[in-house]
């Protein structure tokens, strides 16, 4: 196929958009691949749509190869199925809700587990119909509070979601492995650098869960790896190594001290080291108690206290994952006024216990450890408060931040921090949704069998940005051949009529060989054409320029930057096609 730039709906920009934060956002807009419509909403222009479709093609290839069958559900979905699973409430403000003219409630689908489950239940009734894998590539909607980074975090996005249905756990595990391997092939074909990390399932439910993260310093997802063992996990899934308990007998009694104006960990540590406690005190010796209010979907709000070592902050993502599907918020001044037993900056376990506030602590706070913490009175702290003797928590919670150098959960060495962009997520859902809809089939023995499910997602439109993030340079985009809009960008850099005719004929020859060509036949200067060719990022650039008169054209590799001259003879198109196909 030949596309002439003189006819292509395209306008490139010389300057970065003012609101663009990451390279992919800047380049995709500058190169005319996408255009913003509103916060989190983008139009796909011809070149961008070709990239999107190429990525979809790779995904379809690999999904079909593992026996997936493509279907398509509506994006506009009724309330009832989501009420059955309680996700109508759980989603909160993160989905778009609307009513029809009769007052019936709908949402714009963020995911489709309910519809997949109901459809399979309605169509199949025997164990003989399984295993089954269905998938769709469809537009999804989420009301992102802060859409950012272009199409990396948008309110409307294209996603591939697939679901496996099996009659037993062995079938589910086989489907999970098949999807995991298919995802690896997909991302390898797209030339995305990625890691597979242990993850939490969140509102999706289920047991085993892994994320595919594209490595990128601009990624929103923090993950850790242990170089010694290969352990990887996103920060939400890291399990803190729990220390052994310590003997309590012989520990000195806890003592309450007047500590003055010490509402922060830093001021408390400063006081402790001036108070001659007989040892050097660090923030790790203090116990920080953070108060939040938690509301389960459809339930009442309760107070919850989180205790962490004072040298650690509470990580919002880890806390949110631990409390899923509940909503939570820090207490504000009005909340403290309603609960005068909570003395801001001086909260301790004693007042929490006396007022029946649920108290969850970091796994490092084990019996026998001694802490400096609030005494529930302004300007007073207790020194030597021993876990298991002076206070007992209601349980543990993984809410403290994970840091570089923390021990790996497998004990093999320290953790190294990195950042990535989530491009895929796979879950072993089990029977969460089939339980909700009583999705049973008759087993081999004639008795009902509850179906078990797996859920597997890929961010299709996000992958366009991810490839752009990982494959660009200071000049512009550098698309891998599997996703590039065209195989070859043929630049006519000579106004001579014979050169133009030769370039047009070369484009036709390449087309006959199955090479997709973007022909820059515009009446523009060579400099403008070269800048656009580098910005647009096709993997190969062919230049028909001044060398045409001497029977020579240039072939440039956009990735390596290397240029070589080819003889403009009968085999020219074949030579270029050979380079393109590798």
UniProtKB/Swiss-Prot annotation:
CDD domains: ProRS_anticodon_short, ProRS_core_prok
Quaternary state and interactors: Homodimer.
Keywords: Aminoacyl-tRNA synthetase, ATP-binding, Cytoplasm, Ligase, Nucleotide-binding, Protein biosynthesis
Pfam families: HGTP_anticodon (PF03129), tRNA-synt_2b (PF00587), tRNA_edit (PF04073)
Enzymatic reactions: tRNA(Pro) + L-proline + ATP = L-prolyl-tRNA(Pro) + AMP + diphosphate
UniProt name for this protein: Proline--tRNA ligase
Family: Belongs to the class-II aminoacyl-tRNA synthetase family. ProS type 1 subfamily.
EC number of the protein: 6.1.1.15
Spans through the membrane: none
Molecular function terms from GO: aminoacyl-tRNA deacylase activity; ATP binding; proline-tRNA ligase activity
InterPro entries reported for this sequence: aa-tRNA-synt_IIb, aa-tRNA-synth_II, aa-tRNA-synth_II/BPL/LPL, Anticodon-bd, Anticodon-bd_dom_sf, Pro-tRNA-ligase_IIa, Pro-tRNA-synth_IIa_bac-type, Pro-tRNA-Synthase_IIa_type1
GO biological process terms, semicolon-separated: prolyl-tRNA aminoacylation
GO cellular component, one term: cytosol
Protein localization: Cytoplasm
Domain comment, as recorded: Consists of three domains: the N-terminal catalytic domain, the editing domain and the C-terminal anticodon-binding domain.
């Amino acid at each position: 196929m030949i596309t002439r730039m003189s006819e292509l709906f395209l306008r490139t920009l010389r300057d970065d958009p003012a609101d663009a934060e990451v390279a992919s956002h800047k380049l995709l807009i500058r190169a005319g691949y996408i255009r913003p419509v509103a916060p989190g909403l983008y139009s796909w222009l011809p070149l961008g749509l070709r990239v999107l479709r190429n990525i979809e093609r790779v995904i379809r290839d690999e999904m079909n190869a593992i026996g997936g069958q493509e279907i398509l559900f509506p994006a506009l979905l009724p309330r009832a199925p989501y009420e059955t699973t309680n996700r109508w409430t759980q989603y909160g403000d993160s989905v778009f809700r609307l009513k029809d003219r009769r007052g019936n409630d709908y949402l714009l689908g963020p995911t489709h587990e309910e519809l997949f489950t109901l459809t399979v239940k309605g169509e199949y009734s025997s164990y003989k119909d399984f295993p089954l894998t269905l998938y769709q590539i469809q537009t999804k909607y989420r009301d992102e509070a802060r859409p950012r980074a272009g199409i990396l975090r948008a309110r409307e996005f294209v996603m591939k979601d697939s679901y496996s249905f099996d009659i037993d756990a062995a079938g589910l595990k086989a489907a999970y492995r098949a999807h995991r391997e298919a995802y690896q092939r997909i991302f390898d074909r797209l030339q995305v650098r990625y890691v597979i990390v242990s993850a939490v399932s969140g509102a999706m439910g289920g047991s085993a869960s892994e994320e595919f993260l594209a490595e990128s310093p601009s990624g929103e997802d923090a993950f850790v790896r242990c170089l010694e063992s290969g352990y990887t996990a996103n920060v939400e899934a890291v399990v803190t190594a729990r220390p052994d308990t310590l003997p309590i007998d012989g520990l000195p009694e806890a003592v309450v001290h007047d500590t003055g104006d010490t509402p922060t960990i830093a001021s408390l540590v400063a006081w402790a080291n001036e108070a001659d406690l007989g040892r050097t005190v660090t923030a790790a010796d203090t116990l920080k108690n953070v108060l939040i209010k938690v509301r389960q979907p459809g339930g009442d709000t309760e107070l919850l206290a989180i205790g962490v070592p004072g040298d650690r902050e509470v990580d919002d993502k880890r806390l949110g994952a631990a409390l899923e599907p509940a909503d939570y918020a820090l207490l504000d001044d009005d909340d403290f006024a309603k609960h005068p037993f909570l003395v801001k900056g001086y909260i301790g376990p004693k007042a929490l216990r006396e007022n029946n506030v649920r108290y969850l602590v970091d796994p490092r706070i084990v019996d026998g450890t001694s802490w400096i913490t609030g005494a529930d009175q302004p300007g007073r702290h207790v020194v030597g408060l021993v876990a298991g003797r002076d206070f007992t928590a209601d349980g543990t919670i993984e809410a403290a931040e994970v840091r570089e150098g923390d021990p790996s959960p497998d004990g093999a060495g320290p953790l190294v921090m990195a950042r990535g962009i989530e491009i895929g997520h796979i879950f072993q859902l089990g029977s969460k949704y089939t339980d909700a809809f009583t999705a049973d089939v008759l087993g081999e023995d004639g008795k009902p069998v509850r179906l078990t499910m797996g859920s597997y997602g890929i961010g299709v439109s996000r992958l366009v940005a991810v490839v752009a993030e990982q494959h660009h340079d200071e000049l512009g985009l550098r698309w891998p051949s599997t996703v590039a809009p065209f195989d070859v960008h043929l630049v006519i850099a000579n106004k001579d009529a014979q050169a133009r005719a030769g370039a047009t004929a070369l484009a036709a020859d390449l087309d006959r060989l199955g090479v997709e060509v973007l022909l820059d036949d515009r009446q523009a200067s060579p400099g403008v054409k070269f800048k656009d060719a580098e910005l647009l990022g096709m993997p190969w650039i062919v230049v028909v320029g001044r060398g045409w008169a001497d029977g020579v054209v240039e072939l440039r590799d956009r990735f390596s930057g290397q240029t070589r001259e080819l003889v403009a003879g009968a085999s020219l198109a074949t030579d270029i096609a050979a380079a393109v196909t590798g």
